[in-house]
């Protein structure tokens, strides 16, 4: 389930890139990942500041809208 620090996919697509690793300290607005859907790339930016605690997806993985991409603690 998505918690306060969960960054979720705003749309379905494929993970194009992941810009952070577990332990990365991020600020609001930092790039976390990029999702590609129908040849359009969508940047996923941090909504909260903190430390990346988990990344339950990997590059090339198909995700649905609402899927947790990055957990920030």
Model feature map: region roles:
Residues 1-73:
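Structured functional modules or segments
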């Amino acid at each position: 389930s998505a918690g306060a620090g969960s960054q979720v996919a705003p749309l379905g697509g494929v993970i194009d890139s992941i810009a952070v690793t577990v332990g990365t300290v991020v600020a609001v607005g930092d790039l976390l990942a990029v999702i590609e859907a129908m040849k359009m790339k969508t940047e996923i930016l941090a909504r909260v500041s903190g430390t990346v605690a988990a990344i339950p997806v990997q590059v090339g993985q198909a995700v649905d809208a609402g899927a947790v991409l990055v957990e920030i603690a």
